[in-house]
Amino acid sequence: MSDLTVVKGLQSEIYVPITPPPVWTPVTKELKDMTVALVTAAGVHMKADKRFNLAGDFSFRVIPGDASVNDMMVSHGGYDNGDVNKDINCMFPIDPMRTLAKEGFIKALAPINIGFMGGGGDQKKFSEETGPEIARQLKEEGVDAVLLTAGUGTCHRSAVIVQRAIEESGIPTIIIAALPPVVRQNGTPRAVAPLVPMGANAGEPNNPEMQKAICTDSLKQLVEIPSAGKIVPLPYEYVAKV
């Protein structure tokens, strides 16, 4: 059987997604000198904020770097919220990141971090409005790098759209992916892939050691990945108990 050949301009009734051209911002600082922001498509926001529209929402919420996880919640219907409701850190690892800052592994967690609901949203809006505005705000805050997570399959696509916008603004990024094929197809600049289910990208809930290790290795790969589009497996496994 011959290999599949793709011919430019050939039309087909079968939709074949096209991976967008690579975007890439090189890392120019050591991790110990970086202020790092968290960005998630998993629907995380402050309890005091307006909930996301579960049918589709391209807005985003700012989460302060000093906010308590007890004051956060999730509005998202596209993935099982069981783990993240036990521990926000398994999708939005803000406590592990604060620990890494305290230990000097990174300079600081950014004063603003971002949550949005990537499932069912308008992809054009994410590309033309949400992503560029998130990038602008992070740039204004002097963010040096961004660590992302995503929930469902559509979330992973939306997260990469935002990731690419941040990267295009001059900030290097890396996403912790539960669905590596989705982020690859959508043109992730950099990604890591622990063996985790959707809804616990940063590791098992209430397992700060695993979460810290995943964040640590993700940030190391931010520096070590040599070119756009590479996805590095991480040696951590969590199987959700359902």
From Swiss-Prot:
GO terms for cellular component: cytoplasm. One of its GO terms (molecular function) is D-proline reductase activity. It catalyses: [PrdC protein]-Se-L-selenocysteinyl-S-L-cysteine + 5-aminopentanoate = [PrdC protein]-L-selenocysteine/L-cysteine + D-proline. It is found in: Cytoplasm. Transmembrane segments: none annotated. The active site is at residue 152. It comes from the Bacteria. The keyword Oxidoreductase applies. Its EC number is 1.21.4.1. Keywords: Cytoplasm, Oxidoreductase, Selenocysteine. The keyword Oxidoreductase applies. D-proline reductase catalyzes the reductive cleavage of a C-N bond in D-proline resulting in the formation of 5-aminovalerate. The alpha subunit has been shown to bind D-proline, presumably via the pyruvoyl group. Consists of 3 subunits of 23, 26 and 45 kDa (alpha, gamma and beta respectively). The molecular weight of the complex is approximately 870 kDa, suggesting a decameric structure, if all 3 subunits are present in equal stoichiometry. NCBIfam families: D_pro_red_PrdB, various_sel_PB. The reaction mechanism first involves the formation of an adduct (and not a Schiff base) between the nitrogen of proline and the pyruvoyl group of the alpha subunit. The selenol anion of selenocysteine in PrdB nucleophilically attacks the alpha-carbon, resulting in cleavage of the N-C bond of the proline ring. This intermediate is then transformed to the oxidized gamma subunit containing a mixed selenide/sulfide group and to the 5-aminovalerate adduct of the alpha subunit. The final product, 5-aminovalerate, is formed by hydrolysis. This is D-proline reductase subunit gamma. It comes from Acetoanaerobium sticklandii (strain ATCC 12662 / DSM 519 / JCM 1433 / CCUG 9281 / NCIMB 10654 / HF). The lineage of its organism: Bacteria, Bacillati, Bacillota, Clostridia, Peptostreptococcales.
